[in-house]
Amino acid sequence: MINRMALREGVLIKGKAEGPPGGQGPRLTVIETVEGLSPENYSAVKRFDDLTPIDPHEHIRLEVGAEPLTMRIMDLFAPIGKGQRGLIVAPPRTGKTILLQQLAASVSKNHPELYLIMLLIDERPEEVTEMRRAVRGEVVASSMDREVESHVRLASLLGERAKRLAEMGKEVFLLLDSITRLARAHNKVVGNSGRTMSGGVDIRALEVPKKLFGSARAFEEGGSLTVMATALIETGSRMDELIFQEFKGTGNMELVLDRKLADRRMWPAMDLWQSGTRKEEKLLDPETLRRATMLRRSLAGLKPVETMESIIGAMSKHTSNASFLKQVARFES
């Protein structure tokens, strides 16, 4: 039936099932719809790899008010667009979990058209519960008490599910925490192929995580898949550092968190100089881009801590980015 109807992994099927003799699980006997379409009509849907990928050009606005300031700063200095492939680089205890919750809340409030999915891999069970209560979206998790095969299987299935939604023209926003733990799980599953990189990472271990991260794109025909994944650094593990280096530069947006800022209780603990978005001119209107660029230039030469102190101090005096940018324009004139 799968081959006859050209069903793709991750599709949502509605049909009739019967329990076979012998007490086995139910077996699908009749397929009524595939992704809400008749099987005949679904076969005409273009495959993900046959669609035309283009640069993100629709800005996902994160600002929801005066607070959280993190979302306002991201809008100006590390904007996200539909189809973005973003990496959140996070040392321990730099506010990664809160950042993800704020990101999910902003997306849910400002962009109800986005299908929000959060994938948690090898996370603490209590963190999973907290995310499910805080995030208004689909939270899928394989917690740390599950076997690594569960991590790999769930991530692969969810990645395919996201692609099926995107090829149907839907706008999908996938938050992955973390791509480091997913790569670790794959490293255990693939075993030892005899080709091991430094840090004990098998050369095949990164194939599937890279495929998942690389699936982020916007389509000329409509639809998009945005992937924002966290990468763990400064954990004391050579493996984690190698995984980060393999993913560094593969995205088109990076948000780098800084432990020194977090130690000073400065939020967001964001290194402005290492964070940014490629081709941000396609996301921000010309005036906003010009003023944000001018701000960066005015802060040039400052250390990350001094930079963020200045940004937080200036922006916290205004209840919106629009008000803040008007103030910037007055200084310019």
Language-model features: locations:
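P-loop NTP-binding catalytic core
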Residues: 10, 19-88
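Short nucleic-acid-contacting surface segments enriched for D/E, G, S/T with interspersed K/R
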Residues: 2-14, 24
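Broad gene-expression machinery/nucleic-acid interaction feature
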Residues: 12, 26-28, 57, 227, ...
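P-loop NTPase catalytic core
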Residues: 94, 103-107, 112-333
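Walker A/P-loop
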Residues: 97
